[in-house]
């Protein structure tokens, strides 16, 4: 397992500790390109457990929209990024770096490997052609 992976709902995940099955996740820069800066984030707490694709939180963007955050793999939240709790603007400047959202302990490499790699995600983005409807609320229905 290596490299960053992406979901169709624009979350990213990377395995940061293969021995203990720990991954770091966040939202893709794509979300900001379409919706603008993030002004508020609400997320799960340490110890919460989720199935893959469940909603673990939400972001509010400058336009007033609320966008759900989905967990890419089944797992337990083990760490929250304190930087974004103190200053959500960190996500705006580095959504796929210092603006990571949380770390999860997970068990299924199958779920991880089934996600899109960088090339597949880039093709997925190109197919959407930066269409604002591309991230409408219907895409996030459970």
Task: List where the protein language model places each region.
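Acidic, low-complexity mobile loops and tails
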Residues: 1-52, 93-120, 124-142
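Conserved hydrophobic positions within beta-strands
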Residues: 10-13, 59, 69, 77
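Short, charged beta-turn/beta-strand-edge "cap" motif at the junction between a beta-strand
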Residues: 55-57, 62-64, 84, 108
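Nucleotide phosphate-binding site architecture
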Residues: 57, 78, 122
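Mid-chain, well-packed structural core segment of small domains
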Residues: 63-98
């Amino acid at each position: 397992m290596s490299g960053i992976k992406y979901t169709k709902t624009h979350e990213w995940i990377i395995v940061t500790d293969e021995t203990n099955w720990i991954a770091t996740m966040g939202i893709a820069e794509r979300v900001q390109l379409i919706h603008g800066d993030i002004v508020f984030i609400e997320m799960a707490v340490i110890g919460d457990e989720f199935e893959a694709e469940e909603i673990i939180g939400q972001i509010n963007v400058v336009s007033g929209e609320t966008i759900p955050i989905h967990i890419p793999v089944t797992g337990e939240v083990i760490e929250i990024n304190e930087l974004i709790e103190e200053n959500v603007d960190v996500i705006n400047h580095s959504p796929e770096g210092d603006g990571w959202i949380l770390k999860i302990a997970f068990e299924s490499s199958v779920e991880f490997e089934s996600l899109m790699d960088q090339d597949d995600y880039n093709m997925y983005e190109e197919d959407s052609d930066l269409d604002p409807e591309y991230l409408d609320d219907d895409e996030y229905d459970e």
